[in-house]
């Protein structure tokens, strides 16, 4: 079993990990208060792969470790054109709405809030304009951003879906 895990880790891409939020949960019982912690983490390779997860544990370190393991198992590929996204998109989750718009090189990430900025940095998008509407809780924003990013399509994918061919640029 250990040999399989080591082999899997060798093939895994170099992922950057960031903790977005740690929350303390209190359960009041007869003898006092019991504390647990939940961690929200994002992992990405800055080349188009991104994943996020939440986990709970009695210790902060354990919660982060569990969340990182879950996030690495849930990686998805996002199409990126240069340093930005191919087209405008809106991601929705619950009461959150997240608008993403491509920006010219050098603009940077124009995003309010730590959650959205973190996920865009780790996916490898450096130039994008964003706006969050509705609920601004970290998990809702991250899920809305992921919804928007997963709805992105490249020109080639759209052409294939429509059954047309793209004209090649002559240089």
Swiss-Prot record:
Coiled-coil segments on the chain, per record: none
Keyword Ribosomal protein (UniProt): yes
A matching Pfam family: Ribosomal_S5
An example Gene Ontology molecular-function term: structural constituent of ribosome
Keywords, ordered alphabetically: Ribonucleoprotein, Ribosomal protein, RNA-binding, rRNA-binding
Alphabetical GO biological process terms: translation
Presence of the UniProt keyword Disulfide bond in the record: no
Domain statement: The N-terminal domain interacts with the head of the 30S subunit; the C-terminal domain interacts with the body and contacts protein S4. The interaction surface between S4 and S5 is involved in control of translational fidelity.
Protein role: With S4 and S12 plays an important role in translational accuracy. Located at the back of the 30S subunit body where it stabilizes the conformation of the head with respect to the body.
UniProt subunit comment: Part of the 30S ribosomal subunit. Contacts proteins S4 and S8.
Family, similarity comment: Belongs to the universal ribosomal protein uS5 family.
Protein name (record): Small ribosomal subunit protein uS5
Organism of this sequence: Onion yellows phytoplasma (strain OY-M)
Gene: rpsE
């Amino acid at each position: 079993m250990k040999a399989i895990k080591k082999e899997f880790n060798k093939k895994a891409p170099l992922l950057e990990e960031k903790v977005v939020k740690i929350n303390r949960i209190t359960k009041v019982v007869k003898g006092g208060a019991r504390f647990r912690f939940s961690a929200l983490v994002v992992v990405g390779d800055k080349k188009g792969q991104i994943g996020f997860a939440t986990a709970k544990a009695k210790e902060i370190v354990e919660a982060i470790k569990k969340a990182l393991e879950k996030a690495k198992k849930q990686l998805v590929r996002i199409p990126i054109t240069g340093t930005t996204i191919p087209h405008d998109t809106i991601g929705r989750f619950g009461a959150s709405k997240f608008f993403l718009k491509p920006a010219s090189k050098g603009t940077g990430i124009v995003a309010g809030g730590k959650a959205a900025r973190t996920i865009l940095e780790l996916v490898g998008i450096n130039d994008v304009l964003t706006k969050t509407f509705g609920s601004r809780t970290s998990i809702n924003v991250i899920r809305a951003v992921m919804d928007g990013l997963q709805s992105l399509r490249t020109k080639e994918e759209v052409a294939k879906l429509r059954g047309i061919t793209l004209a090649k640029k002559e240089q």
